[in-house]
Amino acid sequence: MEKKDFPKGTKPREIFVYTCERIAEPLIPLGYKYRKSKNDIYKKDGIFVFSFYFSPSIRFGSTTFTAFFDVSSPVIAQWRSEQEGTEETYDGIVGTSIARLTHRYDDFPRYEVSTLLERERSIQEISGQIQDYALPFFARFSNLPKLLDDVEQEGFFPHR
């Protein structure tokens, strides 16, 4: 997808969606799907769903957002439902700001994407965090015994 500069007066939602599409682009060949309606990029892999979602603040012309990741499992949700005796329950395992996977001090950054320069910087930063930190974090779920041992000893985020 080409870099795109938007004319003044472009709706914030259009800029936000374009930014999400650009972030999703390199993940599509890896089996991820982008859902414009949910502001997320997700992939089902075995019993897990790995996702990235973007929380926009597009009110009153603002074009800022926060980027998050999430690991969930319908299997875990079913187990919790049986344990709790309820029909609906939470399927989440772990999720927070993507930046929390890094050693960054500001671990809940808001990304401004109104100008071409800001948008390109944000796309590069988030894409880098996904490639360098989130995808390796998701890969840990392919070896559950080791993951459980690691989490028991150090938690999900040993660098925190």
Q: Where are each of the predicted segments found?
A:
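Intrinsically disordered, low-complexity regulatory regions enriched in serine/threonine/proline
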Residues: 1-18, 22, 34-36, 42-160
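Acidic, metal-coordinating catalytic segment for phosphate/diphosphate chemistry
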Residues: 27
